[in-house]
């Protein structure tokens, strides 16, 4: 599960860059 955290953070960061 912990291995999915960096991926989730990267996804949120990528989305946040559009705003």
Swiss-Prot record:
GO terms for biological process: innate immune response. Its main location: secreted. The modification Phenylalanine amide is found at residue 19. Shorter peptides due to unspecific cleavage of this peptide have also been identified. It is found in: Secreted. Expressed by the skin glands. Keywords: Amidation, Amphibian defense peptide, Antimicrobial, Immunity, Innate immunity, Secreted. Coiled coil: none annotated. GO terms for cellular component: extracellular region. Antimicrobial peptide with low activity against Leishmania species (L.amazonensis and L.infantum). Shows low cytotoxicity against mammalian cells in models of peritoneal macrophages. Belongs to the frog skin active peptide (FSAP) family. Phylloseptin subfamily. This is Phylloseptin-N1. It comes from Pithecopus nordestinus (Northeastern Brazilian leaf frog). The lineage of its organism: Eukaryota, Metazoa, Chordata, Craniata, Vertebrata.
């Amino acid at each position: 599960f912990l291995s999915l955290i960096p991926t989730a953070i990267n996804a949120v960061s990528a989305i946040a860059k559009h705003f």
